[in-house]
């Protein structure tokens, strides 16, 4: 089993999933992808990559609420045994009048992996509206926009001695800033908090996650706080 994200959760480094998929087939391994850090903001082609499973938390780039996620399962899992046992993932559970006829068989395909009470009347409509919005925005357009607003700020960071992965090997919606030895992470944190900038600190990286609600001025404000000028 090979399980990994489309991009690294700390600094946005992209993994070559096409080549990884090719290699997993050569050695007979399953490929399970965590799309939480990318799907919704970075295009993902299921037909091209053909993962055995793609799992996404709904609360990040899918713009949904906590407690919900989405998953795609390939043919390998069509007859699998789910982790969670409940009545609603059993065969014919949609026929409420016949629920007294207890079934031991699961629903076909991916339905067997649904959590109990998956017909959540509060959270599901929220996630559905979020997905409609993403389909209007389009992940490709999100990448193009975030690439445009981060280009100059990243150039300034690199010129000041900070490390950011080359754009060929990372997403534009998520990238990490790594510090030169001469810089103090504690001082940078103080400046960032003082300026009320929201970023994440993951290990020795400052994780930046711009979206359509940001602009270049937001990123330049961050650069000023990071560099200290």
For each feature predicted by the language model, list its residue ranges.
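Active-site PLP attachment segment
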Residues: 49-99
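Hydrophobic beta-strand scaffold residues
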Residues: 31-32, 164, 199
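Conserved PLP-binding catalytic core of the aspartate aminotransferase-like
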Residues: 147-154, 158-191, 195
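Conserved PLP-dependent catalytic core of the aminotransferase class-I/II
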Residues: 106-109, 120-165
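PLP-dependent enzyme catalytic core of the Aspartate aminotransferase-like
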Residues: 182-229
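Active-site phosphate-binding strand-loop segment of PLP-dependent enzymes
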Residues: 1-36, 61
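The feature captures the short pre-catalytic strand/loop hairpin that immediately precedes
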Residues: 95-113
């Amino acid at each position: 089993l090979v399980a990994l994200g489309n991009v690294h959760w700390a600094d946005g480094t992209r993994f070559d999933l096409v080549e990884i998929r090719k290699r997993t087939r050569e050695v007979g391994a399953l490929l399970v992808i965590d799309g939480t850090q990318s799907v919704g903001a970075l295009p993902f082609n299921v037909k091209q990559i053909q993962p055995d499973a793609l799992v996404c938390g709904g609360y990040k780039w899918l713009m949904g609420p906590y407690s919900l996620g989405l998953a795609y399962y390939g043919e390998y899992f069509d007859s699998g045994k789910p982790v969670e046992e409940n009545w609603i993932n059993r065969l014919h559970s949609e026929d409420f009048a016949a629920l007294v006829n207890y079934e031991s068989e699961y629903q076909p395909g991916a339905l067997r992996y649904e959590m109990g009470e998956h017909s959540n009347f509060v959270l599901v409509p929220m996630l559905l509206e979020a997905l409609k919005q993403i389909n209007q925005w389009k992940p490709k357009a999100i990448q193009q926009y975030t690439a445009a607003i981060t280009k100059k700020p990243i150039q300034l960071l690199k010129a000041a001695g900070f490390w950011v992965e080359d754009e060929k090997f990372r997403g534009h919606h998520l990238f990490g800033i790594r510090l030169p030895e001469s810089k103090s992470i504690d001082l940078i944190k103080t400046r960032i908090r003082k300026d009320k900038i929201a970023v994440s600190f993951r290990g020795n990286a400052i994780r930046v996650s711009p979206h359509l609600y940001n602009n270049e001025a937001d990123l330049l404000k961050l650069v000023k706080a990071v560099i200290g000028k």
